[in-house]
């Protein structure tokens, strides 16, 4: 690797020219990469709810719907508004009771339950159903929602997942750049305190920032990325890959002393040492992200690929761009050096190795409640619930529930040749299910006495088209609640009893599938990440015992972090419980590998157990603390700022996890080394030097 290091030093100017030039195509590519704001679209395409969604789009030309609450408006004004909304690009149909009750079908002919579902006399409001020609996450649909918001603002409210997605887009696009600024500033503050230079932290951030842009610029290979991936990528890549920059800098400082101030030679050797050292840790981090790709819920694949790429770009930038920047700015670095403000914490090492038995007892005592809390976490799946109270969509959903007692809305897709009698009978059976507020089909609205030719063609086309007909079920229960999930199960039984080809779709059925699928995914991802990292540690250290010890200690840190919400009663967004463990495992193993490598080196040189572990800990502590504090600062700041709960919760958990992992690696891991030193030396390569005599 020394040849590579010398090559980087020799061609450092060319490297910087190419690196800065690549920012242009990367930036343009990033700008033109589509962002997907529809989390439910990542469900497997083969499940019935997603197949039904495709039928809705293909057969009815409808992919989503919204409810619009209209307050203090006269019928003629509503009719005008309905026409204006229907003219919007992306809107397919607008349905209110006036759509059905036209001159050919008087108000008296409409069932009271249908009329009452669209009208609330006490609140002086009416309800309008808007259907869209594309899915609820399409750009066209979200743009239509935004235009509707402007048209009906102040006295009207747009509810539903399409509105939630539109609000999410607005918030994320406003806040994502601020996330990066917060993470960068707080990381720089930490490095300013813990390092001896003002310029070097800036160079770290510049190098990592360029790697982030390369990463975002190559997302075109996926076609699109999720908003969650967009929001978290820069922050996580900064936090996760900062280790490599810190390691290069420390190695560079050591090599300068070794080569009497020859900085070019020192940098060449520092690059060589860094490549060797970060290979194992970066591969384990990548493995953690790759584990996310094994999820059936393909949001994991989306985040996993982007973050794995991010680590690769981070490593490449660390051994090419960063060394070139450091050498180019050498004079400025020397002029701006200052005293390190953080106290030397390496003295902790001797205390840890002297009290390892007490620390081991603490490990066991804390482990049991940590596992209990970890297994009793409360998770929520209501995507609308992640929005801040200030979001119009959340206010609209709450008003919809308050004024119309309307929670989730289900859609039944049934064969169009289902008999009128069966259609009416099925709707009657569905009405008997607990929590069903309204169930309608075109046949049930007309009843057995009203002939089809009395129904406006517009209304017919909404409910029947080609081989399928559409029926609506309004539930009193909220999406993702146990009550609505039980309701969905009962309705599915009824629907399938009348037609095996009929399907129940909508936000709530999709969310029920999401719950089932992600529960399995969580177990799969946890198992895959542990196995992959176990195997990598096994290969890197050629040890049977070390993978068990390292993974066990890191899993302990994860149990503690994820166990806290179990005791505080904090509800976590479903995706947090899946990704936190994987990211924390992949990031924390870097600290553990750094310390283990030094421990192995010390034992190989002939040092006894206690001095070897004490020195390894002393030499690693500062690096571990600086890296962990940078990770904490980057994620904690974003967690405090973001008012999107899904992003905020993940960042707060990652921040807390970084601190917990830091303490576990500094205090618990060396204690395990003290206890299992004989086993480790006997079952691992590179711990004993046969050429040394006792």
Please give the residue ranges for each predicted region.
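Structured non-transmembrane domains adjacent to transmembrane bundles in polytopic membrane proteins
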Residues: 45-162, 378-546, 552-571
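Membrane-embedded transmembrane helical bundles of large multi-pass transporters/channels
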Residues: 1-35, 136-381, 496-694
């Amino acid at each position: 690797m020394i040849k590579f290091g010398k090559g980087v030093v020799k061609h450092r100017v060319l490297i910087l020219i190419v690196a800065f030039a690549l920012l242009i195509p990367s930036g343009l590519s990033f700008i033109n990469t589509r962002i997907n704001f529809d989390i439910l679209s990542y469900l497997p395409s083969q499940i019935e709810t997603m197949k039904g969604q495709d039928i809705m789009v293909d057969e009815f030309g409808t992919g989503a719907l919204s409810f619009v609450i209209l307050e203090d408006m006269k019928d003629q004004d509503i009719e005008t508004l309905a026409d204006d909304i229907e003219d919007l690009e992306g809107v397919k149909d607008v349905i209110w009771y006036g759509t059905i009750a036209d001159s050919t079908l008087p108000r008296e002919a409409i069932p009271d339950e249908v009329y009452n579902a669209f009208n609330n006399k006490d609140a002086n409001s009416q309800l309008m159903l808007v259907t869209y020609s594309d899915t609820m996450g399409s750009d066209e649909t979200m743009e239509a929602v935004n235009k509707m918001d402007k048209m009906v603002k102040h006295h009207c409210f747009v509810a539903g997942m399409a509105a939630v997605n539109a609000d999410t887009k607005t918030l994320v696009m406003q806040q994502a750049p601020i996330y990066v600024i917060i993470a960068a500033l707080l990381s720089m503050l930490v490095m300013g305190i813990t390092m001896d230079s003002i310029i070097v932290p800036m160079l770290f951030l510049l190098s990592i920032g360029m790697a982030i842009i390369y990463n975002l610029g190559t997302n075109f290979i996926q076609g699109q990325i999720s908003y969650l991936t967009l929001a978290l990528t820069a922050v996580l890549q900064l936090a996760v890959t900062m280790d490599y920059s810190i390691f290069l800098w420390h190695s560079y400082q050591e090599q300068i002393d070794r080569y009497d101030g020859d900085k070019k030679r020192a940098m060449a050797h520092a690059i060589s040492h860094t490549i060797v050292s970060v290979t194992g840790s970066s591969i384990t981090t990548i493995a953690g992200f790759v584990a996310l790709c094994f999820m059936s819920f393909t949001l994991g694949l989306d985040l996993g690929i982007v973050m794995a790429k991010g680590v690769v770009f981070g490593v490449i930038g660390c051994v090419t761009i960063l060394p070139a920047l450091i050498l180019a700015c050498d004079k400025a670095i020397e002029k701006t050096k200052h005293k390190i403000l953080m106290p030397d914490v390496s003295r902790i090492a001797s205390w840890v190795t002297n009290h390892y038995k007490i620390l081991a007892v603490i490990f066991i005592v804390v482990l049991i409640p940590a596992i209990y809390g970890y297994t009793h976490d409360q998770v929520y799946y209501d995507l609308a619930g992640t929005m801040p109270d200030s979001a119009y969509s959340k206010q609209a959903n709450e008003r919809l529930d308050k004024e119309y007692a309307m929670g989730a809305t289900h859609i039944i897709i049934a064969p169009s040749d289902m008999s009128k009698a069966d259609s009416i009978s099925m709707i009657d059976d569905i009405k008997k299910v607990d929590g069903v507020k309204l169930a309608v089909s075109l046949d049930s609205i007309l009843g057995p006495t009203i002939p089809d030719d009395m129904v406006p063609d517009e209304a017919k086309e909404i409910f029947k088209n080609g081989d399928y007909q559409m029926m609506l079920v309004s539930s009193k229960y909220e999406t993702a609640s146990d009550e609505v999930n039980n309701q969905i199960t009962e309705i599915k039984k009824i629907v399938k009893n009348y037609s095996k080809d009929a399907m129940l779709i909508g936000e709530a059925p999709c969310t029920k599938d999401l719950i089932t699928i992600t529960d399995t995914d969580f177990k799969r991802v946890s198992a895959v990440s542990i196995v992959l990292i176990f195997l990598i540690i096994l290969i890197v250290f050629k040890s049977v015992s070390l993978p068990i010890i390292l993974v066990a200690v890191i899993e302990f840190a994860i149990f503690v972090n994820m166990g806290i919400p179990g005791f505080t009663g904090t509800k976590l967004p479903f995706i947090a419980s899946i990704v936190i463990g994987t990211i924390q495992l992949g990031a924390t193993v870097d600290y553990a590998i750094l310390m283990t490598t030094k421990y192995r080196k010390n034992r190989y040189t002939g040092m006894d157990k206690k001095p070897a572990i004490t020195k390894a800990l002393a030499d690693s502590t500062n690096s571990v603390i600086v890296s962990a504090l940078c990770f904490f600062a980057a994620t904690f700041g974003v967690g405090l700022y973001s008012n999107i709960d899904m992003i905020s919760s993940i960042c707060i958990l990652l921040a807390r996890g970084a601190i917990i992992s830091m303490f576990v690696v500094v205090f618990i891991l060396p204690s395990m080394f003290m206890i299992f030193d004989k086993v480790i030396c006997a079952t691992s390569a590179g711990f004993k030097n046969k050429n040394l005599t006792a």
